[in-house]
């Protein structure tokens, strides 16, 4: 794709790839996730970091949203992104203000921070701050 050519031609530029590399309504949301796997090929460039939003970004909001996460089935996008980028190139982003109408800011934050996927070692620390600090040139 043209974007991958841009990544190839700009190795000194840091890229923050938004929304788990998903675009609303695209085939990346449908099993077997071939479109998403193709988008994750951007991870081969070490100057890329993926921003991960709350689950409300990829799941339909229930009619009445309680505190916590009411979703039973969550597509494997977070796991696939972690396998491709590793936690040191993943950073949480609230997607505020749209998250307020989806899962709410608190759920967008805690849903990623407390995800079992990020409970090993300092994975959550990387996703919730260290990766962003490193990407933007702060000491980690």
Spans of model-derived segments:
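Catalytic pocket-lining loop regions of alpha/beta-barrel enzymes
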Residues: 1-91
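Short Gly/Pro-enriched loop/turn and capping motifs at secondary-structure junctions
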Residues: 55-57, 96-99
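Mid-to-C-terminal alpha-helical segments outside catalytic/metal-binding sites
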Residues: 79-91, 100-140
